[in-house]
Amino acid sequence: RAIASYAAAQFLSTAKVTFPNKNGGGQTINYKLADKYKETLAGTNIWSAATAKPLEDLERWKEIAEEDGGTVEIALMSKATFNMLKKHDTVKELFKNTTVTITPTLVKATIEEVIGMTILVWNEKIKVGKITKNVFPDNVVTLIPNGQLGVMEYGPTPTKTDELLGMLGDRDVVDIAGTFSTVEVVAESKSAGVVNNVNVVIEDLVVPNPSIMDSMFIATVG
């Protein structure tokens, strides 16, 4: 699941999926999202700047993403990005004359009403090597439809390909039933012919097959 989530997040935040060199061949899949569906803010327009207009940005991007007949209903972002948005002066201005208690729920609902989309905060974490990082990166906002965005496709890993080509040598690899995934036990250290430690290596290769290439928008906002 972690691999699938990470691959999906890479696609949704960059329109690319890059596989680690160790078990994914170091390859990058570029889905070639049209330039009109991407924007990188700079200078006084980044959302951390007082001069930014994040609500107008979101409305403008929604219009662009819907030009070809699609319907964009969700603004996807990390928790840090949403916090930056809701603390911006243009958002605070929405509550200047309010007499009710301003709660986080009210702030989110008000922003959603203004931009015409639901804000979805993706705050999942993943461990890559020894580093824990966000599955969906900060400073990126992706507008998407509500519903199925495509499917996840599974394929043979480099190890499985070696097996199919008869190039495994003396490596002992076991298939996980019903999948392209493999399990390999690799000796990590040994002395006097006795194995002291082993690594159990499970490989899996999964990529998104999206159906939203003409109804999404990826913005880098900081």
What are these regions (language model features)?
Residues 6-25:
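Short, glycine/acidic-rich hinge or "gate" loops at secondary-structure transitions
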Residues 92-222:
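Sequence/fold signature of self-assembling virion shell proteins
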